[in-house]
Amino acid sequence: MEVMLDFLYRNGKDVQKARNEQISTFTNQQHVPITWKQDKSKFEMIEFKGYEAVRKLSKVTGGERLFYDRTKPFTKMIPYYNKFETEKTVTKPFAYIIPQAYREVVDRLIMNKVHVEQLAENSRLMVENYRINSFETSPRAYEGHYLHSNTQVESFVKEVQFRSGDYLVYTDQPAARYVIETLEPEATDSFFNWNFFDGILGQKEYFSDY
């Protein structure tokens, strides 16, 4: 933390300039990357400092535990894989419409300074939709979520009934990158992959008028 604060103190203006340039570039992009893959053919060697790892008996449980022996420091060169290639892109949409049922999603958008509007009246609109064709779910929880991955969708155009108060999120705004990387289902850290839309995955019976 101290190193980061010192760096920002000395380079704050350059960081802000780079960030503003990135926002401007993204605003003008029509095709947006949403997933990446590591290029293992490209790497650089860096110096890594650590301590030898050993197993020792725990005074609490009596079982073995991992222990880093600070009397045995080491330094060695290791490969650092810091090159990634775009794996999948999407065409940036004009906007997203989020039904009111997903207020948790909208709250997180607002907390991240996304400008959100609401429809003033009921509307039937021809819009592009996604159908979830496949996905994988982790068997173990992470941060309280059973994350989805390798999500595959197909798009289709359909007339949809929207209600007054449904949320409208335009992509022509400084937070556009966050908007797209969370609302595109196939994006690595999308709200779909973080389980916020799991309600759509179960088969439901339509209401009975009795």
PLM features per residue range, with description:
Residues 1-127, 131:
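Hard-cation-handling environments
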Residues 108-111, 117-118, 134-210:
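Catalytic centers of hydrolytic enzymes
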